[in-house]
């Protein structure tokens, strides 16, 4: 909770409206909404009401005096993030718009803009999209005299992306490629990955996988930074 005006509890009318909303939830959804202490992770299948439960929880927190700037909600897709934003704004007009709601990648991009120095990045770093990634990979493969008919650029991009999704950097991937022979292309991709990453670093560029890797790396390596951001969201 916050003692400032931004975190003051909402009116009785809004509270009554929240009770009406709670009556529409099943027991599992209601348990998510009414849990007001600490973080909550919601796992469920498609169409089971995950977004509803999360958005109602945000509205419930606001109704109980939590300042919107101290609430963070992240999801995997732009569609889900957009639904969260529109639903919360409709439930709590004027305050719902100030809640941090985004995809994981979007949140990490914002975090890195704010904490670029802690992440070892210049303030002017750029983000490469899929087309940019493929262009760099194509250039690296040309330098290595590798042909697309033997190893497609998309295959390389996907393998690098999977590695980054697992928080495996280029050097670790190269070392592991010498041990695990689970893919005939792994050692070749390891060399491409290494050179690809060197070119991104030289251009002060991040791809989508880097957004999460660099954010996680900064938080893991800096206790003060981690505590500050942990305290930011309640």
Regions found by a protein language model. Name each.
Residues 53:
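Hydrophobic positions on the alpha1 helix immediately C-terminal to the Walker A/P-loop
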Residues 2, 10-15, 19, 37-40, ...:
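A basic/glycine-biased coupling hinge at the interface between accessory DNA-binding modules
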Residues 56:
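Base-recognition residues in the alpha-helical recognition helix of bacterial helix-turn-helix
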Residues 22-36:
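N-terminal pre-P-loop "Q-motif" helix
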Residues 44:
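The Walker A (P-loop) glycine that initiates the GxxxxGKT/S ATP-binding motif of P-loop NTPases
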